[in-house]
Amino acid sequence: MSEKIALGLGDNTDYEIVWNSAVFENLIRRHDIRVAELATDKPIASERDLVISILGFLRAGSGGERHVAASAIVEDFARHFAMKITLGGTSVRAAIAMRKLGHTSALHLVTINEHVRRLIPQDSPYVCSNTVDSSFPHLIVQFDKGMRVCAGDIDICSSRANRIIYHDDTDNVIMRLNEGFGDLITGAKVFLVSGFNAMRDEQLLVDRLASVQRMLARLPADAQV
């Protein structure tokens, strides 16, 4: 049966850590990080690089999204903190919110794993473009105004609250699509298209948009996109 609401196209697992200045101060000492090294635009190839980046954002009071060299960096770093595993992606978060209001949605996913199966609305039909389980977690770092970190020659305090996202998400970079999603949306009244922001290859993006156009052709003529 076709749902009235169709949501796509990407999804991911979020590791939402609980800010802990004492942990950051220990990491500063462990990695011998100096204030002159703090920056928000350096490549992130190690835990040390990640700490430098987070502290750079904290000092600037700004937020952003950055690529890390490997998901293992995110996995290892997150273990230092209390954290909550949630789902990310505009479409999946919208589906979860609308289910609380009594509405089900058809979902297109690019990542499937135990967390996705557990956390998506259980009565919302979905297709996934991946045939095997995968995990490319997004590290979600949120800090409030006035968060202070003091260790070595570093003494910084955030001027405002903000949020930073770090990941190496192959599934969302490639954004493989499953055109079988068209079978779930033939009666949809609205189709939310999102998730292309992680893509880097122009020709691959062109190919994916052509796939989206073919899926859109399965919608009723009066559907909103």
Regions found by a protein language model. Give the residues of each.
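Ribokinase/PfkB-type carbohydrate-kinase core domain
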Residues: 1-225
